[in-house]
Amino acid sequence: MLKGALHAHSTYSDGEFTLQELRDIFLAQGCSFLCMTDHAEYFDQPSIDRYVSECESLCDGKFGLIAGLEYRCARNMHILGYGATRPATSSDPQEIIRHIDSQEAISVIAHPANDSFDWIEAFDTLPSGIETWNTKYDGRYAPRSGTFMLLRRLQHRAPDMRAFYGQDLHWKKQYRGLHTMLDCDSLEPAVILSCLAAGKYAAQKDNLQLPSSGVLPEELLAEFDRTHARSRRRWLILKNFKGALDRLGIRVPESVKAQMRRIF
């Protein structure tokens, strides 16, 4: 069993960590792999070549660092390509899904917004998975039950669609406690991706385990909603307070903002 993490950004796009730093901090957490998803629009061919080469150079018998991209689409939808390394020219999400799939990579709609659910359900081309918990977008305390319900409806059409659980790591002061436990005996990137695609994993956060199927008891989904609502209320209070300070011309120190990112 390998411990790892999904959905991270480096200084190749808008992250604060270098690839070497990411390897070091996740190794220190007892992880064996990390799936990168730097933003595709930051790259040209020379930089994507450097990115892939550096990821490969940081793979060894202790750790697998897997290059991948996050594609920005119409209506601010984001689609992760775990193992994808070719930028795209289209902003149509279904074209992007096909583009990712053509690379034998894993296509995952990242942190889908509530108002995009109906649109996603109308897609003719569906992704390999839905990111049902993104601890940057949803918060560290609980995901939205509605994202799991979206996945459940899509699974009527695509039974092998998976639930993915990502950190969306950007900042040095950010929560990093959601991990992916992978039933895999190899650190080869291709093998790790194959095990992810086959759903041979579960998410782990403290004592909570969440399956790759995304099928959860109704009681747990209800608890998620209550916890998420409480966290959201606290976050909105702080956001409104910051907005008031901004209007008064008072700048919130970066150290305080960094601490808030870690808490939420």
Which residues make up each language-model segment?
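Charged catalytic cores and adjacent phosphate/nucleic-acid-binding surfaces used
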Residues: M1-L6, L19, R23, R75-R86, ...
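Conserved beta-strand positions in the central sheet of alpha/beta enzyme cores
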Residues: C35-M36, V108-I109, E131
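An N-terminally biased module of ancient metal coordination in phosphate/nucleic-acid-related enzymes
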Residues: M1-A74, E254-F264
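Histidine-centered active-site/metal-ligand motif
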Residues: H7-H9, H39-A40, M77-H78, D101, ...
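Aromatic-lined carbohydrate-recognition surfaces of secreted/lumenal glycan-active proteins
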Residues: I106-S116
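Surface-exposed amphipathic alpha-helices with a cationic face
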Residues: K3, L27, S53-C59, D92-V108, ...
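Short, flexible loop segments at the rims of nucleotide/cofactor-binding pockets, characterized by
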Residues: S10-D14, D44, A84-A88, V108-I109, ...
